[in-house]
Curated annotation (Swiss-Prot):
Residues that bind Cu cation: C19, H86, H87
GN (gene name): cutA
Cofactor(s) this protein cannot do without: Cu cation
Any matching Pfam family: CutA1
Name of the protein in its database record: Divalent-cation tolerance protein CutA
Location of this chain's protein in the cell: Cytoplasm
GO function terms (MF aspect): copper ion binding
Species of origin: Citrobacter koseri (strain ATCC BAA-895 / CDC 4225-83 / SGSC4696)
Amino acid sequence: MLDDNSQDISIPEAVVVLCTAPDEATAQDLAAKVLAEKLAACATLLPGATSLYYWEGKLEQEYEVQMILKTTVSHQQALLECLKSHHPYQTPELLVLPVTHGDTDYLSWLNASLR
């Protein structure tokens, strides 16, 4: 049973976008850009991440800043395009996760912030 401040949502169809950046300055710049263009309502930057991955056949290990961006389905494509066009990586991490449940007040704020 849901309490009064949470709901299963179809509107505003919130999504979370994950993106990594090579350093805090780049993450700040990307976040400022998408927030100024109202493509995301909130950007949470988590410095201190270490990513391990194979690139061109070689195991890489890099310090990165994990970005968590909150937006809606109707803004996600423009957000992804903006991040990709301004990102220093050839192939940036761009993952979209659906939000299946959330606080009504927060989701209302998120939706209003993108107008």
